[in-house]
Every structure is written in C-alpha cells, then in structure tokens.
C-alpha cells in the first residue's frame, strides 16, 4: 500500500459517507456545456414574436401593455396596427459622397509648398503627391506632371486644380510670403 492512497476501510470518516455521482455524457464537457448554454437562451426571433404576441393579447383584452422601452400603453387607446408599426425598424443610410481632389499648401516666408490630396468621406485625407515648393522648383509644372500621371483625373478637374495652384502662387508672390498683408 502506498502512503498517499486513502482507502475507506482505513479512514472511517470517508467510509460512512455515501458517494453520489452524476452521470457523465460521452462527449467532452466543454462542447456539452456550450450546447447546454445555447439551449437555455431562446433566439432573438423568439423573443420578438413573444413580445408581439403579448402586445396583441393585451390589445384584445383592453389592458395597457408596456413593451421593452415603450413609454405609452398600446392597449385600449391604440389598435393592432400600432403593434405592427412598433416592430418595423427603419435604417437611414446617409447619401454616398464622392471623394474630392484638394490642394494643400504650406505657406512659408521664402517658399510655398503645394500638394495634391484626395479627401474620402469617412476615411480622411489620402496624399496623392509630395509637396512641391515654389520658387525653389517649378511647383506648377511638377503638379501638372503628377496630375497627368493620374489617368482617372478628368481634364476638367485638372484645369480647375492647376488654376487654383496658379492663384495660390500668385497670391503668395503678391504678399511677399507674409499673410498679414
């Protein structure tokens, strides 16, 4: 006999207790507990149909019915259509906004930097070009070359963006680099 083993004959306290054991399923306990948990909880569809049935019964009996989150009684004053309307859910989807091409600029005392970005609603700004600096290099020509590389930019958009870049460069030249004038 090993010193760590316990036998009912040698320990009277253990021998006098009856042992009750529950039958164990043949499947692993983790999967059976998951199935058991799932079977306890009715699906949401069942809850909605139970709520609708309780509301309809309250309307027929003329009793006030307070559903989940409702502030006003539906029974007595309303009809069965009110119950059906409360079950309808409406989802409003905002209008799809198209991405926009924008010019960003850095206004400095001796330089002005111009870059092309794409603004995507809900996402933010996506840079399409690095900053091109004037008068260090010809920023307008570099921007035009970058716009021509992007085949998906229309000719009209390209002209508008280049005109805006011209206006910004001219404004910077007139002000001498300072924004206070």
UniProtKB/Swiss-Prot annotation:
<keyword id="KW-0687">Ribonucleoprotein</keyword>
<keyword id="KW-0934">Plastid</keyword>
<comment type="similarity">
    <text>Belongs to the chloroplast-specific ribosomal protein cS23 family.</text>
</comment>
<dbReference type="InterPro" id="IPR006924">
    <property type="entry name" value="Ribosomal_PSRP3/Ycf65"/>
</dbReference>
<keyword id="KW-0809">Transit peptide</keyword>
<dbReference type="GO" id="GO:0009507">
    <property type="term" value="C:chloroplast"/>
</dbReference>
<protein>
    <recommendedName>
        <fullName>Small ribosomal subunit protein cS23</fullName>
    </recommendedName>
</protein>
<feature type="compositionally biased region" description="Low complexity">
    <location>
        <begin position="14"/>
        <end position="36"/>
    </location>
</feature>
<dbReference type="GO" id="GO:0006412">
    <property type="term" value="P:translation"/>
</dbReference>
<dbReference type="InterPro" id="IPR038447">
    <property type="entry name" value="PSRP-3/Ycf65_sf"/>
</dbReference>
<dbReference type="GO" id="GO:1990904">
    <property type="term" value="C:ribonucleoprotein complex"/>
</dbReference>
<dbReference type="GO" id="GO:0005840">
    <property type="term" value="C:ribosome"/>
</dbReference>
<comment type="function">
    <text>Component of the chloroplast ribosome (chloro-ribosome), a dedicated translation machinery responsible for the synthesis of chloroplast genome-encoded proteins, including proteins of the transcription and translation machinery and components of the photosynthetic apparatus.</text>
</comment>
<feature type="region of interest" description="Disordered">
    <location>
        <begin position="1"/>
        <end position="40"/>
    </location>
</feature>
<dbReference type="GO" id="GO:0003735">
    <property type="term" value="F:structural constituent of ribosome"/>
</dbReference>
<keyword id="KW-0689">Ribosomal protein</keyword>
<comment type="subunit">
    <text>Part of the 30S ribosomal subunit.</text>
</comment>
<keyword id="KW-0150">Chloroplast</keyword>
<dbReference type="Pfam" id="PF04839">
    <property type="entry name" value="PSRP-3_Ycf65"/>
</dbReference>
């Amino acid at each position: 006999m090993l010193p760590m083993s316990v036998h009912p004959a040698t320990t009277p306290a253990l021998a006098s207790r009856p042992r009750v054991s529950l039958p164990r399923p043949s499947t692993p306990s983790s999967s059976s507990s998951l199935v058991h948990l799932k079977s306890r909880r009715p699906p949401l569809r069942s809850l909605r149909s139970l709520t609708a049935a309780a509301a309809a019964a309250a309307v027929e009996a003329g009793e006030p019915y307070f559903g989940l989150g409702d502030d006003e009684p539906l029974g007595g004053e309303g009809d069965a259509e009110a119950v059906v309307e409360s079950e309808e859910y409406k989802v409003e989807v905002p209008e799809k906004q198209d991405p926009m091409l924008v010019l960003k600029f850095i206004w400095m005392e001796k330089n002005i930097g111009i870059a092309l970005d794409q603004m995507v609603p809900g996402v933010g700004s996506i840079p399409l070009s690095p900053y091109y600096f004037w008068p260090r290099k010809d920023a307008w020509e570099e921007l035009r070359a970058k716009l021509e590389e992007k085949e998906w930019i229309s000719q009209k958009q390209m002209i508008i963006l280049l005109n805006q870049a011209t206006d910004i460069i001219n404004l910077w030249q007139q002000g001498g680099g300072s924004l206070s004038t």
